[in-house]
Amino acid sequence: MSSITEIISHAIYDAGAKVVTNVPGIGGTEVFAAFCEISSQNHPRSFHEEVAYTIAHGASLAGERSATLIKAHGLAKAANSVVDSLSAGTTAGFVVLVFDDRLSRHSDCIFNVPALLQGLEIPYRRLQLHDTYRQIQDAFTWSESLQLPVAVLIDTDDLGKLETYTPLQRAVSSHNYKRNVIQHVVGPFFPEYQRKVLEAKLSGESWQMIKTPTPPTIPDSLPDVLQQIVRLYAPLFSVFKRLRGDIVTGDTSTSTIFASPPYNCVDICTYIGGSIPLAIGACLAGYKNTWALTGDFSFMAAGHLGLIEAIQRNIPLKILIFNNEKAQATGGQPVPTGILDRILTGYEPYVRQIHKPQDTNEIETVLQEASQVQDMRIVVADYRGG
């Protein structure tokens, strides 16, 4: 006989999950520790549930099975990434194990967790106390059949109970990443299409026949205000498109406009500040030459949380920050001078500056160095005068 904790951890491992994240909390901590022991690896724990969720989602989009182990309260913290991940979809199976401390013995408060899951619209099942191993295994195939993240709701009071199970041979992922910006770039360009696809997936209908929109050609297909931004950023992207990595992640910020032709410089995008954890997930899935693009506001709002994860995992991530001291995507609200520099002080050895982002020679020199080194690089392009 084995405990439910042990069975869940074995099921995750045997399902072939390559990237498994966890933020400490009742239930998830115990299962994660057991998973680390089974896999003979000391996987790092994450500090923030939105980041942990997004890392796993990035790995799934890049073609590797993944899982996130978090408390129900943590799912609430990750909600922005959750709803955007449903619009972006998945490639390989992505299972979110949500641990429900129903009586709040180790949590902030008691709340209606099923209502949260239903409101987020993430497909979920409650773990039943029979054939636990199969239920966790099936969750990965369910995710892959829907091409969506799915959740399994687990009562923490059940984790010490005992069951028998028959282990299966460890699965090998056979999913390959394919660039698809119409599906994977969440933002103002394709929301109606992505919503129709999501509704079809949730209702069990065929979504492949839904008419796909045509990506805008930049700058000609854009409103005048966006054309001005494109002209400002065009010299940098004319160089970046030649040096870009295997996967480039973006934020829902103005730089993600360059996902469209003829630049094709962004591949995946979910929420503001999500580019860095998405890129970490892609790196962990095997795409080592990965770039994350972000605006200064997006980076300060949430992106910097991902830097901690990249450092503790020793990932040689490449990050490009567009520093214009404003929240350009939401109307140009000013960002106080000096805050970006203060945040980056702790990462000074990795920081490189593009002082004149209209000078293609300087751009080429800085980006070339960043792309070639086997270390993290944080490139800051100075658009404060633009």
Task: State each model region's role.
Residues G16-V20, Q41-N42, I247, V266:
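Short active-site oxyanion
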Residues I26-G119, P123-R125, D131-E144, ...:
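Thiamine diphosphate
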Residues M1-K18, P123-T254, I354-G386:
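Flexible, low-complexity linker and terminal segments
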Residues A17, G245, Y287, I315, ...:
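A structural motif
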Residues F111-P114, P167-R170, P262-V266, I308, ...:
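Short secondary-structure boundary/capping segments
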Residues Q169-R179, D267-G274, V335-Y347:
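Acidic, Ser/Thr-rich peripheral helices and adjacent loops at domain boundaries
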Residues M1, T5, P24-G28, E49, ...:
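Generic structural signal for well-ordered, non-membrane alpha-helical segments
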